[in-house]
């Protein structure tokens, strides 16, 4: 991902304030609510029958935290996203058979959740920088798909 120094600083500064536990669970939960077909990848998570069930589900929260942990690793390696996400790309492609379009959806949901949490601090410039990052991460996660 090519970010200007200002964009990189904006992404890093905001990410330092992110509560990964809270934002991760909320982002994954919103993905599962807004795009219910994504729930099929999470059969083992138990009750996902309503928005409240999804948002209160401890397995959704735990996996959301794990997802944002991986995203944090990506932020530390913006110059090598494909390498950073190579194993996760293989896992999601070969074993989990996740449609790579879902990575784009989750990235967009994450941007919305960040905007909700940070309000005026999430300026159009910060949003534009995060859109570049989530697009780069989605592309890296889709890299191993044939």
Swiss-Prot record:
GO cellular component term, pick one: hemoglobin complex
- Output the PROSITE patterns linked to this UniProt entry: GLOBIN
**Positions of post-translational Phosphoserine modification:** 44
**Globin domain spans which residues?**
2-146
The source's superkingdom equals: Eukaryota
Q: Which InterPro entries match?
A: Globin, Globin-like_sf, Globin/Proto, Hemoglobin_b, Hemoglobin_oxygen_transport
Q: Which residues are noted in the entry as heme b-binding?
A: 63, 92
The record ties this protein, via SUPFAM superfamilies, to: Globin-like
Modification type N-acetylvaline: residues: 1
GO BP term, example: hydrogen peroxide catabolic process
Q: Which tissues is this chain's protein expressed in? A: Red blood cells.
User: From the Swiss-Prot or TrEMBL record, what is one GO molecular function term?
Assistant: oxygen binding
- Indicate the family of this protein: Belongs to the globin family.
Q: How does it assemble?
A: Heterotetramer of two alpha chains and two beta chains.
**Protein name as annotated:** Hemoglobin subunit beta
| Organism listed in the record | Piliocolobus badius
Which gene is annotated as encoding this protein in its UniProt record?
Answer: HBB
